[in-house]
Amino acid sequence: MPTTTTSAKKHQERWQEIVSDPHLRELPYTVETNYRGQIVLSPHQADHSYLQGDIIGFLYEHAKEGRPFPEFPITTDEGVKVPDVVWMTARRREEVDGTGDPPTLAPEICVEVMSEANDWDEMEAKIDLYRKAGAEEVWVVEQDGTVRFFAEDEQERSTLVPDFPTSV
């Protein structure tokens, strides 16, 4: 289980500054930070939100032993990252909650929905960061709705939610 290091503490403290700023709370973007604590803004189009909603709905319906959450912040070695959707069991949630805010332990599944602003170099970096933070699987949804599943390596289907479709 990832622990809270000095670097993680700095990222968590910076994140608390950001979420406490009333001007930043009103931004219509996903907010993340890089390894220096600088704010990274990611605007997205409506299709992105539709895909997030579809993923959350499917997880509620077919992965009842856990619960999905949208835009969940995770403290990583490279700053605070915010997967579009996460899924975790109640047991993992207790563990996650014990690692600070934002947590240093990732939920079991982290999902990134790609937009025009993303490329595969960024996705591969996020897959690595989420896995290092404890995610068992990372799913990447391409703009056409194709879902790619990653654990140690890329896999054809999710092992945690085997009924999840390969396209949404």
For every predicted segment, state its role.
Residues M1-V168:
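Gly/Pro/Ser/Thr-rich low-complexity, intrinsically disordered segments predominantly at protein N-termini
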